[in-house]
């Protein structure tokens, strides 16, 4: 069998990198020639993780076929618009994910492992256990980081009942204190001062097709929402430019306070009435407070989907 690429979504976060790194390692242990690659450079949080566990960043690829690869495994995503550029021209043989299934179709049967847990890394951990393969320290560290990132250290409503035990076991294998390491990791991802507005709105952004509309939903983590809002003018300029160049109908930016577990929603586009209806708030100067919201997957995208489909 020729080489298989394993990768997470575009604009990769710690779970996209961690789950693909871990699953590629597991596949190699099971005799498959698999390489973890990335669809973008690591963000600051993930760079902290890679440095902490002395792991080289996976190489960034633009397409699979240009690398002579025709079979791929997706982790932490399944929607084609979030995947590699030539996704429709290669064979997807496996998916390991914890998101909704949408805009996904294959010509052949495949293995899909979908679970409503806190992270794709949580699923990969279970697959190690099921195959009786030991998890080395670096893999444990990256899987743990993916889980911490996606659940905001187990505080997000996306946290599954099984996730705390998974986190404790991975922390033990990685040789770290869960709380101390988790907080340091999350804080590393809140350093936004060096980011341009264009970079800031693309750190962690995904496009969703909602009733024929291409809606971009981005998220940045911070310890002070006002710091981000102080740059509102340049952020809005970057958003409007992105809307125009990419054909988005709307752009929603979640500015998430990781210490107090709240978000400010900044929204621009042609369907702001639907965005207001989704969250039962009124945008003032294009933004509004959303108490208790920290999860794009559970507290933003489903609400937008329902509102746009009415």
Curated annotation (Swiss-Prot):
Cofactor note: Binds 2 manganese ions per subunit.
Entry keyword set: Cytoplasm, Hydrolase, Manganese, Metal-binding
Reaction(s) catalysed by this chain's protein: diphosphate + H2O = 2 phosphate + H(+)
SUPFAM superfamilies in UniProt: DHH phosphoesterases
SMART domains, A to Z: DHHA2
Alphabetical list of PANTHER family matching this protein: BIFUNCTIONAL OLIGORIBONUCLEASE AND PAP PHOSPHATASE NRNA (PTHR47618:SF1)
UniProt name for this protein: Probable manganese-dependent inorganic pyrophosphatase
Organism: Streptococcus thermophilus (strain ATCC BAA-250 / LMG 18311)
Encoding gene per record: ppaC
């Amino acid at each position: 069998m020729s080489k298989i690429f394993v990768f997470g979504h575009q604009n990769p976060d710690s779970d996209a990198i961690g789950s693909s790194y871990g699953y590629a390692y597991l596949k190699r242990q099971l005799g498959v020639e698999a390489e973890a690659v990335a669809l973008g450079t690591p963000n600051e949080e993930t760079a902290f993780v890679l440095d902490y566990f002395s792991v080289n960043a996976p190489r960034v690829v633009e397409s699979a076929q240009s690398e002579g690869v025709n079979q791929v495994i997706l982790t932490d995503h399944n929607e084609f618009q979030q995947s590699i550029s030539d996704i429709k021209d290669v064979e997807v043989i496996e998916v390991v994910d914890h998101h909704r299934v949408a805009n996904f179709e294959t010509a052949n049967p495949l293995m899909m492992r979908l679970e409503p847990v806190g992270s794709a890394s949580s699923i990969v951990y279970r697959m190690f256990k099921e195959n009786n393969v030991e998890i080395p320290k670096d893999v444990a560290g990256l899987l743990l980081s993916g889980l911490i990132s996606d659940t905001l250290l187990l505080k997000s409503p996306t946290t599954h009942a099984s996730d705390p035990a998974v986190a404790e076991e991975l922390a033990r294998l990685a040789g770290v204190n869960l709380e101390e390491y988790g907080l340091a990791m999350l804080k590393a991802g809140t350093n936004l001062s060096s980011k341009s507005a264009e970079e800031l709105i693309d750190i962690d952004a995904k496009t969703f097709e909602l009733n024929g509309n291409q809606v971009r939903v981005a998220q940045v983590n911070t310890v002070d929402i006002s710091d981000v809002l102080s740059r509102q003018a340049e952020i809005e300029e970057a958003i409007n430019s992105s809307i125009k160049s990419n054909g988005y109908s709307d752009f929603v930016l979640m500015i998430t306070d990781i210490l107090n577990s709240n978000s400010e929603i900044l929204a621009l586009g042609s369907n702001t009435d639907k965005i207001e209806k989704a969250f039962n708030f009124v945008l003032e100067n294009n933004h509004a407070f959303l108490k208790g919201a920290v999860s794009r997957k559970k507290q933003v995208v489903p609400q937008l989907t329902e509102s746009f489909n009415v």
